[in-house]
Every structure is written in C-alpha cells, then in structure tokens.
Amino acid sequence: MTMKHLLLHAAALCLLSIPAWGQNLLLPTDNRSLFEQPSSFFQFVDRDFEGAKTSPWEGGQFGFVRDPRRLGGRIAYARFHEGLDIKPLQRDARGVPLDEVRSVADGIVAYVTATAGMSNYGRYIVVRHDWGQGSFYSLYAHLREAHVTAGQKVRAGTPLGTLGYTGSGIDLRRAHLHVELNLFLSSRFEAWYAAGATTPNHHGVFNGMNLIGMDLQAFYLAQHKNPAINPAGAVRATESGYRVAVPGEASMEILTNYPWLL
C-alpha cells in the first residue's frame, strides 16, 4: 500500500467517524440491544493483555478497540475495527447460530463470495445503496449461508443469509455478524493491487481494502435520537482530522463519487 493510499484512507476514516449519516437504516438482525445494553449487542473478543485473559465486549465496536498497548500511564489500542460485531440471539442444540441477516436498506446485491475460505470475512455479501449522494455499500460477513445472488434487488429487511462463524480466527462460541457501511474507493483497485500484491485478489473491486468503513455505530445511535440526518451536511460541519495534499493532476475517484467530502 502506497503512502498516498494510506493517507487518503486515514483521512477518509477520520472524516467519516462522525455521529450522523443521513439515511434511515434498519439493524441487520433481531438483536436490538445496541441502544439499551450494548454488552448484549456486541460480540466479545478474546484478549490476553499483561497476563490477564479477558473477553471484553467493547472489542466488537467500531474504531480503535483491539490490540491494547501500554504507553506510559495509559493504554492505547493499535488495531482498527471497521465494522460492528453483532451477537446471535438464537442457537440450535449444538450451539450453531440461527439468526437471519437482513439488508439494512433498499438496494442491489453487488457481490456474494463464491466460497467462505478466500477472505478473513469468510462468506460475505455486499449490497449497493443509492441515496443520491454517491453509492454506499453495506457488507455482511462471517455468514453460514447466503440466500441472495449478485444483481438481485432487495428491500430493507430482505433476508440475505444466516449468521455464522466463517472466516479466520472465529469459532462457534464467537459466532457473529460483522456488518459495515462503506464508501467505494476506486474502480482501478484491481490494477493497483496486482502491481504490488503477493497474494491473489479473489474479490475484485469488492475486496475489503477497497471499501472504506463509516462509523455505523455512531450512525445508529444518532438515528435513534434524531431520524432527520443528512450525511453531506454532517461531514461539512465536522472539523477535519487530517489535511492531505494531492498533486493537482491526480485523479481522485472518491471525490468524484462523493464530492461532499470536500
């Protein structure tokens, strides 16, 4: 990954970590505990830090919530989590989750993985949503089953698949839905990846590296309080965390697709 790409990705993440997004989205499963008891909503992570083994639910949230490091008198988290890990509510006698996963909004299925073993996401689905401010992409990962196909139109609440534990580093006890809401970085991603990658790209432009995660957690909390929210206005009203200098001749597709980021 080039320094330019890293800087752009960091800037976009910072710009998007704001408490309002402007679209009335549904929660993707029957788990509604986010608003009253988040410890029952987020799936825990296993943590071994300074000799203590814990299972904090906070590690399932969006943002820098993983890989704690002690820096002097404080603890900082080095790993960014780009989505929300949602606990299942239903399991069969063997403990296998049964929860239905549904589209958060109307859209078109953009991508469904062919197999579960070619990504850390496991089996995942991407749905494109067009709300008049550039295309947004919701992503649903670690699914046991997918019930839709690419190109299929879906409505808010349409069943997409079944919650599972596919993907690396996840076992039955930590089964969960990883859900994201993303911006699309570049249609030239495949060429960029091929020029420097040492492993194959099995997912084309819907590789997770080409999707920039928004703060979906903050959106749901803000929407719960005030459904009348506007993403472009919220971004313009937010203080910039980074300023990135880009050569004038550079072609930045993300700004063409989402001019309200400026």
Model-derived regions: residue spans:
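Bacterial N-terminal signal peptides that target proteins for export
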Residues: M1-A10
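Bacterial N-terminal signal peptides
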Residues: H9-S17
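Sec/Tat signal peptide C-region and signal peptidase I cleavage site
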Residues: I18-G22
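Surface-exposed, glycine-biased beta-strand/turn segments
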Residues: Q23-R123, H202-L262
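Small beta-barrel nucleic-acid-binding modules, principally OB-folds
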Residues: F80-A93, G134, A141, L181, ...
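Zn2+-dependent peptidoglycan hydrolase active-site motif and core
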Residues: V96-L98, R102-E145, L172-H178
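Surface-exposed strand-loop junctions at beta-sheet edges and helix termini
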Residues: V104, V148-T149, V154
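Conserved, short, structured surface segments that act as functional micro-motifs
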Residues: M118-R128, H142, Q152-P227
